[in-house]
């Protein structure tokens, strides 16, 4: 359950690291799960470390539940151990010399709970995670999925106002990730505090998060729910993330001029600066110019071929770069190889056009 009022987290993160500057505003409501996505070096982990108190703000503030945790201009800074925050790191960082039970009990103990009560709380959390029978095991005796659940239990055992998850599923194999993602979704649904999930995996974000924030070069480039972002990507990175070809151009009626030279026919009238998007599955390939050519037809050269699920993803160079998805049977029939010349077509009805502004 989410709310749009009284946000649990209200932060403006300005962090200078050499020539890189993170300048990011975050608001996360109680019960809301927000995913922070972006390419490597975008500033995602820096943001998480700053919220946790592991990196210093240059300017801005971190306010949680109405209380300032970090505000340089007022010389306010709350140490990491005193922040009501739970963190699950990418490699979990379980204490190797402690049992699963004592790893989870560490959080309550750090907050002043006596040893017996802390272990009782920890046992309850392990039971909720389905790990009651693993309480005495050391981290080296746990599978990746089990270690992830112990780390999550340790973070949740302190009843955090803010839960920070740094690539929590990245270290798992495909099968374990599938099962653990479903379990994580259930536990996040029960968490009443705010949750910020840092991930590079769009599936993790789409399954686990209520809202997505896309960061590139230290700044927010797009924000919204999954449906909005997947329907209207605004950068090349976001387009790749959601699996679309994306172009920016000038619209004049039913034509969009891309790059000042390449016209794309569309099915709806637009005017001014627009984005044009279409899925790789909308691109058809031919060995020669097809008869009765669709309005969008152009020569291209294959620059790469790779497997993409049950299909092949073909990268094309030409007037515009484009990705096309075709079946292995179609690729064999066309004898496709890198460097080969082909013709690409896209129906106007397959394109999606929307304004650059708004």
Language-model features, listed with the residues they occupy:
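C-terminal boundary and immediately downstream tail of ABC-type ATPase nucleotide-binding domains
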Residues: 12, 230-253, 277, 296
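The feature captures the beta-strand-to-loop junction immediately N-terminal to the Walker
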Residues: 37-39
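ABC ATPase nucleotide-binding domain helices that frame the ATP-binding cleft
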Residues: 45-48, 150
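ABC ATPase nucleotide-binding domains
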Residues: 84-86, 94, 99-234
